[in-house]
């Protein structure tokens, strides 16, 4: 079964009522991944979601905490010194931002086949 890495924009859209169409699609994708058990995210994704939800979506802290708890069923990848070194390598090889490279490295660690992100080039292999 394919494994999918979830970037923070998908989690943000699932919690953003300002665009009901994007929200519905993001909720559909997250629900499928949660049900199938083939979703992966990273600590960075959780941090980016929490920051955006609190600052831009103006969600209450308890709502953000509850949403993060719901994501516990996805595999979570934590950074390590080795992953930071690998992030620097990926950044330099593919000429992408450090933070996008960190997503690529976390997806590698989670043995993901596909990264669900609007920040990276569609169809790009890393």
Name every feature range the model reports, one short phrase each.
Residues 1-41, 55-63:
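Short, well-structured N-terminal submotif of metal-dependent ribonuclease cores
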Residues 8, 100-101:
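Conserved glycosyltransferase catalytic-site signature
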Residues 18, 43-47, 69-93:
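Acidic catalytic patch
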Residues 28, 44, 48, 66, ...:
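Amphipathic alpha-helical interaction segments
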Residues 48-75:
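Active-site-proximal, substrate-binding regions of enzyme catalytic domains
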Residues 95-97:
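Beta-rich strand-turn-strand
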Residues 101-126:
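Acidic, metal-binding active-site segment of PIN/NYN-like and related structure-specific nucleases
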